[in-house]
């Protein structure tokens, strides 16, 4: 995961205040009896919750929480597979829909879905519970396009037009979670026989590819605190909320047709030393307190119907019709797609 960490003070304060007000609430369901002991949560390195939330879980259940973070989302799943005979912990958070099938197929997860799981969201055959969601989208710098008299792009296809030459920066799908999501979005949009030619067109039109999100967004993009030359960047649907000025106007926006949905899950690890504690923690991640805290702490959207910060509602809604791919298809083809993509670059 490489998520925006810069956000408006009002946004962070409102999310923290809402979470603090809810933190004293009991869990909405699942395992709540105080039993004691420690539950180890294995997670990616972007996991964060406001002060006091994990402490409230301990007060409610008796379980202390220890965190283990082996890396980003891809590294997380790889480490779970490598250590499945001697699990790193009891529960896991941060497996997303691009890796969920692989985690299940490799046998790293026990069968458990929270009784509070949101209806209609994938459970990986009863092994995972959706906790948060978001969209990876192209973002545009409104001010740049207005100042240069160029229409903002609204489709994938426009980006290979000479009018947008040298304007786009994305991240490497082999080294970046959003980069992989964008590659999958192009496969979902153009199909398995059309995406390669689309990427050739992007490359001919001056596409810049960076290794990570931070460089693309803060160095090469013109619409954030960097002074980069490129007004189109691969980022997140939530990013424009962090770019709202004191005047209440968003300096950036999403190209909604390019948005691809990302869902993050929690589950119980097979062979967990404390499976009951793990179940209780999975349930807790769906509590109102945690769900309300997710936007301000992890810059993702909750999966339940808790209120979003006002800036998100106005400037950074989830896409109404995002691109989605079957997790099993991703698991079966990820390596081949990445190899084909690398071959395009020569």
Predicted regions and their residues:
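Short, low-complexity disordered leader/linker segments with a strong preference
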Residues: 1-39
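Early extracytoplasmic/lumenal segment of secretory-pathway proteins
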Residues: 25-102, 222-225
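A structural signal for short loop-to-beta-strand junctions that line the ligand-binding cleft
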Residues: 87-92, 110-140, 157, 166-173
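Periplasmic solute-binding protein
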Residues: 97-107, 123-151, 179-189, 263-267
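Short beta-strand->loop
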Residues: 109-116, 127-130, 157-160, 231, ...
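Ligand-binding pocket segment of bilobal, Venus flytrap-like solute-binding proteins
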Residues: 184-257
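Mature extracytoplasmic/periplasmic domains
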Residues: 260, 264, 269-325
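Extracellular/periplasmic bilobal clamshell ligand-binding domains
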Residues: 311-346
